[in-house]
Amino acid sequence: VAYKDPEDANKNFEKYGFNNHRFIEKDGAQCYVIWNDTDAIIAFRGTEPKEMSDVKADLNAIQRQGMHNTGDVHGGFQGEINKVWDDLNFTVADIQDRNIHITGHSLGGAMATICAKRLEEEGIHPHCLYTYGSPRVGDRKWVKTLDVTHYRFQNNNDVVCKVPFWMMGYRHHGNNIYI
C-alpha cells in the first residue's frame, strides 16, 4: 500500500477499519501512518528506480554512527529516515498507546528497521516489525541492541537481501522467513 497514490491508499485503509491516516513525504522518502483505537501501522515505501534520491540512498553504504552510540548503520538508509523523522515522531506521539506495527519493503524495510530502533530508544516499544526484501541495515553491535520481534521475509533469489555485503560489517536482524 505504501506504493499507492495517497487517495487510493486512504480508501483501502478505511475499508479495513483504519479511519485515521497520515501520509508523510519529504524529498522522496515516504511513509504512511494509519491507526484505529487499538492498533497503528507505520509503512515505508521502498526504492522507486526513477527516484534518484532512493538510488543515492541505496548506494550510500558508508556506515554512520547510530543514535545513542549503539553501533553503526547504513548512511543512506539513515539519511532517508532522517528526512521523515520529525513529522513521523510528531505523529507517533499521538498513537504511542496503541500496538504499533512497523513494515516496509526493500529500502522501506531498512527504514522500518531503523524506525523501530529509534522508537525503542525513545521508550516506545513497537509491537512487531515486518520487513520484506530488506537489505542489511547495521553492524553487529547495532543489530544486537535492537529488541523488537522482527519477521524478515525474503525471497532466496532477491539480491537486495544480500547487500550491503556482510564483509563490510553489515548484519541482518530478525527471524528470517523464506518465501
Predicted regions and their residues:
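Non-catalytic, mobile gating and regulatory segments of ester bond hydrolases
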Residues: 1-103, 107-179
